[in-house]
Amino acid sequence: MELLCPAGNLPALKAAIENGADAVYIGLKDDTNARHFAGLNFTEKKLQEAVSFVHQHRRKLHIAINTFAHPDGYARWQRAVDMAAQLGADALILADLAMLEYAAERYPHIERHVSVQASATNEEAINFYHRHFDVARVVLPRVLSIHQVKQLARVTPVPLEVFAFGSLCIMSEGRCYLSSYLTGESPNTIGACSPARFVRWQQTPQGLESRLNEVLIDRYQDGENAGYPTLCKGRYLVDGERYHALEEPTSLNTLELLPELMAANIASVKIEGRQRSPAYVSQVAKVWRQAIDRCKADPQNFVPQSAWMETLGSMSEGTQTTLGAYHRKWQ
């Protein structure tokens, strides 16, 4: 089982490798990836350094080019694939069908991974990508139960990657319109949900308010942990009551499911957080490296250590964690 860690910059990439990541995933410094935030991601020069460092340590580098090409910008997405391939990427994480075809025809020797943004949630969808683009892996969305994940692993020949820890998206990724509705800009094309330029914080007599494109998302009292204003994690008035109507600010943590994921032959567990600090990457990678090694050695008796859970809890949104859809009954 591969431990795949995020990096939004070179220090985070080095922290991931030095703390046990088998592979690191990154994005380029433009809107071809779904974490397009100011100050984040890699220029061509930094990408060269990243490839060199990762390969010196005999690890792998995956590059996310997982937004959807604009009608007048297809050549930019092609150039992103070209640069990633020519500089030595081990895998390309793609969602756009045209980009999958381009990469398969131009660079058949480089692994193609179907991004979570493609939202492949069933056997036929996965096999479609395998049949047409010979993909080496599919990243499953965070809306599937553990039973559904196991079932897919049994029936498809394509290795599967699952999100194991980090920010929790409760929507069918690549198909959510909340951010687009409020800001007029789609995460599928500009590369960011709740883009930072639409975010505003304001201290008021009622508390600290977070707004997205001037729409109130949440209000925090003194001592409350303030989360980034994503619409699905806001507090709203519903039938006269104010609460988290869709999802509370919380992070996914599947550490206790590790034996089941290993038994299902899941190829890779993915840590979310390219927008997070090197310190976050370092601590989370270290915990997951220890846990994977312990589980491999004795899966029958594996129990997450309390110290691991405390560390992950302290790194989590709202300092709380959940199994998310893996154990939700509504499925």
Curated annotation (Swiss-Prot):
Disrupted gene: phenotype observed: Deletion mutant is unable to synthesize ubiquinone under strict anaerobic conditions. Mutant shows normal levels of ubiquinone after aerobic growth.
Quaternary structure, from the entry: Forms a heterodimer with UbiV.
A Pfam short name: Peptidase_U32
Record family assignment: Belongs to the peptidase U32 family. UbiU subfamily.
Protein name, entry field: Ubiquinone biosynthesis protein UbiU
Function: Required for O(2)-independent ubiquinone (coenzyme Q) biosynthesis. Together with UbiV, is essential for the C6-hydroxylation reaction in the oxygen-independent ubiquinone biosynthesis pathway.
InterPro entries registered for this protein in UniProt: Peptidase_U32 (IPR001539), RNA/ubiquinone_mod_enzymes (IPR051454), ThiamineP_synth_sf (IPR036206), UbiU (IPR043692)
Gene Ontology MF terms in the entry: 4 iron, 4 sulfur cluster binding; metal ion binding
Domain of life, per lineage: Bacteria
Pathway(s) where this gene product acts: Cofactor biosynthesis; ubiquinone biosynthesis
GO biological process, one term: ubiquinone biosynthetic process
Residues the entry annotates as binding [4Fe-4S] cluster: C169, C176, C193, C232
Cofactor(s), by name: [4Fe-4S] cluster
Gene (name only): ubiU
SUPFAM superfamilies attached to this UniProt entry: Thiamin phosphate synthase
Keyword set, alphabetical order: 4Fe-4S, Iron, Iron-sulfur, Metal-binding, Ubiquinone biosynthesis
